[in-house]
From Swiss-Prot:
Keyword terms, alphabetized: DNA-binding, Metal-binding, Nucleus, Transcription, Transcription regulation, Zinc, Zinc-finger
PANTHER family for the chain: SQUAMOSA PROMOTER-BINDING-LIKE PROTEIN 4, SQUAMOSA PROMOTER-BINDING-LIKE PROTEIN 7
Compositionally biased intervals (Basic residues): 172-182
The protein's name: Squamosa promoter-binding-like protein 7
Tissue specificity comment: Expressed in young panicles.
Organism phylogeny: Eukaryota, Viridiplantae, Streptophyta, Embryophyta, Tracheophyta
Main location: nucleus
GO cellular-component term (any): nucleus
Length: 360
């Protein structure tokens, strides 16, 4: 046991390795400074340091704090001030240029026209065309013959105009379309505002079949319900109707007299009864007397027997009829006979023996 121990003075037995522990040589430790407690700092300096760490420099005024950052911030602010000074210098140069710039005087854009548009109307000055060339049928602008359009207020080529029109074809078509729409709307408005609900057709003209003049009030078939704006006023209807009635009676009498005049010239066949009253024979003799009278001088062939034309003085017939006071007397129509004209009423109206008309 003693030989196996680490200590002992005996020899090391065979087969056993001996281990010797040698001491490690190390450098002596360096002297460390003595630990000093931190110096007490003032609260204002500490707040400035914290503010410098959290400042994002987003405002116009830079953040100032103590230490090394203060110099950097001061340098940065100085550089910014230099930039601001450069901007103000540029603005000053711009103002000087604007003050020294010469105002451009507008001129007519037609080639060969150097008229300044300084004392003309604002319209010509704005569109850069003088008054003479604005109305000219053709001018040369940019090497092409053009014309100034009064509605577009600019130049067009001559192919866009119709004949000597001052406005282009496209603008004229739009203008005409707007006029047609306005006229149609006005006509519809007038028709809806009519007291009898009767629309006005054809751009203000009366409907087809009605007279277009004031003589429409003379119609005997017109009534107060059918009166429109184209007819006569109400106070004159009675007087006009009376005049129209007299005129119609005169025309009827003239037609009957002319028919009797030609029937007397061609006597009926032998054996055919005339069926006329004695008064009609008197009228026939009166017509024969008129035929025997020579035509007035200067009458020409119009009043000859060969011409077959008769001119009646309707006013004379109307006056004579009104003065005699003997109206026409209706006579029953003749019955239809074999070989004769069915429904022929030659004696439907027989004039009075005392009534007459002047045949010229």
């Amino acid at each position: 046991m003693e030989g196996n121990g680490c200590g002992g003075s005996g020899a090391t037995p065979r087969g056993v390795v001996g281990m010797h522990w040698a001491p490690v040589v190390t450098s002596p430790p360096s002297p460390q400074p003595p630990f000093l407690p931190p110096a007490p700092c003032r609260p204002d300096v500490q707040m400035q340091q914290q503010g410098g760490l959290t400042c994002l420099k987003l405002g116009k005024r830079p953040c100032f704090w103590g230490g090394d950052g203060a110099g950097q911030v001061a340098q940065g602010s100085g550089g910014g001030g230099g930039g601001g000074g450069g901007g103000s210098a540029d603005q000053g140069k711009r103002k000087e240029k604007a003050a020294t710039a010469v105002p451009v005087v507008p001129r007519c854009q037609v080639e060969g026209c150097d008229i300044t548009l300084q004392g003309v109307k604002e319209y010509h000055r704005r569109h850069k065309v003088c008054e003479v060339h604005a109305k000219a049928p053709r001018v040369v602008v940019h090497g092409t013959e053009q014309r100034f359009c009064q509605q577009c207020s600019r130049f067009h080529v001559l192919a866009e105009f119709d004949d000597a029109k001052k406005s282009c074809r496209r603008r004229l078509a739009g203008h005409n379309e707007r006029r047609r729409r306005s006229n149609a709307s006005e006509a519809m408005a007038r028709g809806s505002a009519h007291p009898h609900g009767m629309p006005v057709l054809g751009h203000g003209f009366p409907p087809y079949g009605l007279p277009t003049s004031s003589a429409g009030a003379l119609s005997l078939l017109s009534s107060a319900r059918a009166t429109g704006p184209w007819l006569m006023p109400t106070p004159d209807i009675s007087a006009r109707s009376s005049a129209a009635l007299d005129e119609l009676i005169a025309e009827n009498r003239a037609a009957l007299l002319s028919w009797q005049f030609f029937s007397d010239r061609q006597p009926p066949p032998a054996g055919r009864p005339t069926g006329r009253s004695p008064g009609s024979e008197t009228a026939g003799g009166w017509h024969a007397h008129l035929q025997a009278r020579p035509p007035p001088p200067g009458a020409g062939g119009q009043h000859e027997h060969q011409s077959g034309h008769v001119t009646l003085d309707l006013m004379q017939a109307t006056t004579a009829a009104g003065g005699s006071g003997a109206p026409f007397r209706p006579v029953p129509a003749r019955p239809a006979k074999e070989g004769g004209d069915a429904g022929c009423t030659s004696d439907a109206w027989t004039p009075s023996p005392m009534e007459g008309a002047r045949v010229v």
